[in-house]
């Protein structure tokens, strides 16, 4: 494993072989080329692995899987569906809050900063970890999907039962890497305004997740968000990939 990779230690141990694979070398080269050509990449380099940093492998209790980062200015910070404090809550997250209200009676937060979930063991993972500014899905097919497949496999191999919330057909592809005899897989349409009314609303995934965790002797997730979120802690230097 390249010692210059900046990654939380439990994930670094589990994912070390991935960084020695040729596809990661190609991905690194692609990202460097993008920046050299003046293209802005979101999130910032130090936040590519933010979801892994905040939720160590042995603490994962729930996985929520997104597609790729927000591509608007100031939005993406390495956690799927989450935005920085002070940034307007995106429509998909508004719908997630609506489902939380219907499911658990939790009033919608006045912000879209989900870091408190991550610190409780909710892995907020995008399938693709970078995007070009203003171009949705622009970094798909460059290697991130293979890397996040490895992330899901690593979670699946943990002894502790985990809940996988897979919203939309893109996220549901990752179910192939999950042992349903040990873990709970919950599927629903994506919370986007285009599909939320097709089955995301009413899915009750949040209460189902907590019921499963409790049944396994694990603490449930407190899905309430702090009224005033702390500022995200920035990593000082970007990872070498």
Curated annotation (Swiss-Prot):
It catalyses: Hydrolyzes single-stranded DNA or mismatched double-stranded DNA and polynucleotides, releasing free uracil. Belongs to the uracil-DNA glycosylase (UDG) superfamily. UNG family. This is Uracil-DNA glycosylase. Excises uracil residues from the DNA which can arise as a result of misincorporation of dUMP residues by DNA polymerase or due to deamination of cytosine. It comes from the Bacteria. The keyword DNA repair applies. The active site is at 68 (proton acceptor). PANTHER family: URACIL-DNA GLYCOSYLASE (PTHR11264:SF0). It is an enzyme of class 3 (hydrolase). The gene is ung. Keywords: Cytoplasm, DNA damage, DNA repair, Hydrolase. Transmembrane segments: none annotated. It is found in: Cytoplasm. InterPro entries: UDG_fam1, Ura-DNA_Glyclase_AS, Uracil-DNA_glycosylase-like, Uracil-DNA_glycosylase-like_sf. GO terms for molecular function: uracil DNA N-glycosylase activity. One of its GO terms (biological process) is base-excision repair, AP site formation via deaminated base removal. Its EC number is 3.2.2.27.
């Amino acid at each position: 494993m390249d010692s210059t990779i900046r990654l939380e230690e439990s994930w670094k141990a589990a994912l070390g072989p991935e960084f020695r694979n040729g596809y990661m070398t190609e991905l690194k080269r692609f990202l460097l080329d993008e920046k050299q050509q003046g293209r802005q990449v979101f999130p910032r380099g130090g936040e590519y692995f933010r979801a892994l940093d905040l939720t160590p492998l042995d603490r994962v209790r729930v996985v929520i899987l997104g597609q790729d980062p927000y591509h608007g200015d100031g939005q993406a910070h390495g956690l799927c569906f989450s935005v920085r404090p002070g940034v307007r809550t995106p429509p998909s997250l508004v719908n997630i809050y609506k489902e939380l209200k219907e499911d658990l009676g939790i009033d919608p937060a006045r912000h879209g900063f989900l870091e408190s979930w991550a610190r409780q063991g909710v892995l907020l993972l995008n399938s693709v970890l970078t995007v070009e500014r203003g171009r949705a899905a622009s970094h798909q097919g460059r290697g991130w999907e293979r890397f996040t497949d490895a992330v899901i496999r690593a979670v699946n191999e943990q002894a502790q039962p985990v809940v996988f919330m897979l919203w939309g057909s893109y996220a549901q592809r990752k179910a192939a890497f999950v042992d349903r005899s040990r873990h709970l897989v919950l599927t629903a349409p994506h919370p986007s305004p285009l599909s939320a009314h097709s089955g995301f609303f009413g899915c009750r995934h949040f209460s189902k997740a907590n019921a499963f965790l409790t049944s396994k002797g694990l603490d449930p997730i407190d899905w309430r968000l702090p009224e005033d979120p702390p500022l995200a802690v920035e990593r000082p230097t970007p990872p070498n990939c």
